[in-house]
């Protein structure tokens, strides 16, 4: 496969860094029923909006494992949630690998898992990521920028039937 370098997303000088405004935060927190000493996983941390809401409700013995496939999202969330660094660990990875990622942090059980599925505005707003429907950009569409295969490679190398199955 053609390997493209991973784009690095940085705020434009003078602009605020990306901050995720979570949707349905009250409903999500009610469903998670956050306990101050609980252990939680945000499997799609993105910009950290939902994670912040969880961390604000945790006590000193509470813990959050924050995961994301997107290395840029992990870096931004780590910065946005630095005040909770004693209670929050970050891992670049796929939530499908939750068990080994959790075990790496000594977690055998958790009290709740949040998965906010889909693209984030972090990806859509950056034309170079290839997800934008408002700006021209390369046909990339990788959630995990460490992956070599881009959407352009798939379109060029797969047949119509295989592409239809993906879509």
Regions found by a protein language model. Name each.
Residues 1-4, 9-167:
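S-adenosyl-L-methionine-dependent methyltransferase catalytic core, i.e., the SAM/SAH-binding region
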């Amino acid at each position: 496969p053609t390997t493209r370098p991973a784009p690095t997303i940085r705020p434009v000088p003078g602009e605020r860094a990306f901050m995720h405004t979570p949707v349905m935060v009250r409903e999500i927190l009610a469903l998670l029923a956050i306990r101050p000493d609980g252990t939680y996983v945000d499997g799609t941390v993105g910009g950290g909006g939902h994670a912040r809401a969880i961390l604000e409700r945790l006590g000193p013995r509470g813990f959050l494992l924050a995961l994301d496939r997107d290395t840029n999202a992990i870096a931004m969330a780590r910065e946005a949630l630095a005040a909770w660094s004693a209670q929050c660990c970050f891992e670049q990875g796929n939530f499908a690998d939750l068990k080994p990622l959790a075990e790496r942090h000594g977690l055998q059980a958790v009290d709740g898992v949040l998965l906010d599925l889909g693209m984030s505005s972090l990806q859509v707003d950056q034309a170079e990521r290839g997800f934008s429907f408002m700006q021209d950009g390369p046909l990339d569409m990788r959630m995990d920028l460490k992956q070599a295969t881009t959407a352009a490679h798939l379109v060029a190398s797969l047949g119509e039937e295989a592409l239809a199955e993906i879509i």
